[in-house]
Design a protein with these regions (language model features):
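Short, charged/polar connector segments at secondary-structure boundaries
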Residues: 1-106
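Amphipathic, charge-rich alpha-helical segments that serve as recognition/docking helices
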Residues: 49-53, 100-160
Length: 160
């Protein structure tokens, strides 16, 4: 049985996964292209994706934010070495909002996976992990069938 190390990561080093099916579909619809970057570099990217997540399910986000405010982050996320969030978009969004509202530094608790989208060989592995995490947690938002299809297609076909 292997234990995973969970780290408390300052939010400024993290960014939403532009390779995520739902997010990449939204980026293409709204902006055409959008350069993924951390808040430390420029908060514009994370702010635009956060707005999409807020609009996508305001009730779920409000519930997550209230829970984190009262009890702290109960479920850790998963991030890649470069700060790309593979699991935990809603928690990250809630923490960013709390950081702004409260005015104190917040930290995203996550396992750091030893992969990067820069390495083509890692992409399929990352997608398998992302989907396994997504399917293994009941409270996740369901993927729209089109977003899921685009996600799978982009991973399998465009990485050839």
């Amino acid at each position: 049985d292997t234990m995973l190390d969970v780290y408390r990561i300052p939010l400024k080093y993290l960014y939403y996964n532009d390779e995520n099916g739902r997010i990449s579909t939204q980026i293409k619809r709204e902006f055409g292209t959008l350069m993924a970057q951390t808040d430390e570099t420029s908060p514009d990217y994370n702010n635009k994706i956060a707005t999409f997540i807020e609009e996508d399910n305001a009730t779920a986000l409000k519930k997550t934010k209230k829970s984190i405010k009262e009890k702290g982050q109960q479920v850790y996320g998963y991030v890649l070495q470069d700060g790309r969030i593979i699991d935990g978009n809603r928690r990250f969004t809630a923490l960013r909002q709390l950081q702004t509202e409260i005015g104190t530094s917040q930290y995203f608790e996550a396992v750091i996976l030893p992969f990067t989208y820069d390495a083509k060989a890692d992409r399929a592995q990352i997608k398998r992990l992302e989907l396994a995490i997504q399917m293994g947690t009941e409270e996740k938002l369901q993927y729209d069938p089109v977003d899921l299809s685009v996600d799978i297609y982009q991973t399998i076909i465009s990485d050839r």
